[in-house]
Amino acid sequence: MSVRKTISFAVLVCMPMFAGCRATPSSKAETSVAYWTKHHITVRGKKDVNPYKATEDNIAEGKDSFTSYCMVCHGLDGQNTGVPFAETLSPPVPSLASTEVQKYSDGQLKWVIDYGVWPSGMPGSKGTLSDEEIWSIVVYLRHLPAAGSVGEPEMYSH
């Protein structure tokens, strides 16, 4: 395993643990570094075209995959509703309905899901999710429900 993969794996394993322990918001310095990093990564795939159309079946398939793999950090609605650590991570977990996220092309969204965003807590899913699952998640991201309209993840309500 390469050093980069080892470090990425360690960050992914430790990030949720540290997020749960964190009692204070990120410092101004942490937030500044995270913001700069987030906005200076190269997101590839701009011209890649999603082979899945926005049909009811494809949206439902994307929702199922999203719920299985993405809901823990992004909430049921993709807008962090009910996720207790979403704002305390550095950088905070973005709302997937935000203009910032929605301005990405479908191919760019797939690339982010494939490769993740280092050094944030966003893991890459290439090898875990199939291309079909990822493309269906992208379809779902284009059709997210209204914030808070589907409730909170049960795992955080206990």
Where are these predicted regions, by residue range?
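Flexible coil segments in periplasmic/lumen-exposed cytochrome c-class electron-transfer proteins
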Residues: S26, R44-G45, T67, S120-H158
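Electrostatic cytochrome c docking/interface patches
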Residues: K28-S65, S157-H158
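Sequence/structural segment immediately N-terminal to covalent heme-attachment motifs in c-type
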Residues: E56-Q79, A86, L109
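Extracytoplasmic electron-transfer domains, predominantly the class I c-type cytochrome c fold
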Residues: L89-H143
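Bacterial N-terminal signal peptides that target proteins for export
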Residues: M1-F9
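C-terminal motif of bacterial Sec signal peptides marking the signal peptidase cleavage site
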Residues: F18-G20
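Short, flexible, mixed-charge acidic loops at enzyme active sites
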Residues: T37-I41, V83-L89
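Bacterial signal peptide processing site
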Residues: R22-T24
